Amino acid sequence: MILHAQTKHGKPGLPWLVFLHGFSGDCHEWQEVGEVFADYSRLYVDLPGHGGSAAISVDGFDDVTDLLRKTLVSYNILDFWLVGYSLGGRVAMMAACQGLAGLCGVIVEGGHPGLQNAEQRAERQRSDRQWAQRFRTEPLTAVFADWYQQPVFASLNDDQRRELVALRSNNNGATLAAMLEATSLAVQPDLRANLSARTFAFYYLCGERDSKFRALAAELAADCHVIPRAGHNAHRENPAGVIASLAQILRF
């Protein structure tokens, strides 16, 4: 079994760019940014429970990494960068720390490196279970209306929230709930030590208005790019800013 993905081919000899979306996104999420880099072959992945991979279920990050590895092999992708936002960034960091043959580097936008104590994990588990129950049982428009009121999305205005609620409500609530629980921060290990000892290039992007993740970025041994005029979802709020950072990283 492999993950559903869309491919766009570039020039031979350059590494692939493998894009991983955030929770409730899909393979289209990164394309406004990714299609600027047409010299590179691009793979836009649907993570388990999302988009064309909605029917794929996992028990945890190990399963996601295994599926990602098999997907890369199936497309004969031998050299690549992982580019991930939020959940996709966490998947990218986890997979990279577990080891992926051919990995050139990891570019993470607003991805959490992991909670650091049992109390934080217990609280996050309670919260994610409550959200998962709502995703399973309530209309998605109502759930996402509340989801985007969370502090991490404070930089969004009302129009941006309405647009995101409408977009994300096309998902399957049950499969979102399953993926939320399987990849909760409560079950993700703290990756700070692994990232400090890494053997791959590591870049971190965060929005200027995303105070939580700017603080987290300062804790990581990564080259950090702060995206101006953007909050947590920087590639949506300021795609040009993210494109500029990726171009600098890739020496485009």
Swiss-Prot record:
The keyword Lyase applies. The keyword Lyase applies. GO terms for biological process: menaquinone biosynthetic process. Keywords: Lyase, Menaquinone biosynthesis. Pathway: Quinol/quinone metabolism; 1,4-dihydroxy-2-naphthoate biosynthesis; 1,4-dihydroxy-2-naphthoate from chorismate: step 3/7; Quinol/quinone metabolism; menaquinone biosynthesis. Its EC number is 4.2.99.20. Coiled coil: none annotated. It catalyses: 5-enolpyruvoyl-6-hydroxy-2-succinyl-cyclohex-3-ene-1-carboxylate = (1R,6R)-6-hydroxy-2-succinyl-cyclohexa-2,4-diene-1-carboxylate + pyruvate. Pfam families: Abhydrolase_6. GO terms for molecular function: 2-succinyl-6-hydroxy-2,4-cyclohexadiene-1-carboxylate synthase activity. Monomer. Catalyzes a proton abstraction reaction that results in 2,5-elimination of pyruvate from 2-succinyl-5-enolpyruvyl-6-hydroxy-3-cyclohexene-1-carboxylate (SEPHCHC) and the formation of 2-succinyl-6-hydroxy-2,4-cyclohexadiene-1-carboxylate (SHCHC). Belongs to the AB hydrolase superfamily. MenH family. This is 2-succinyl-6-hydroxy-2,4-cyclohexadiene-1-carboxylate synthase. The gene is menH.
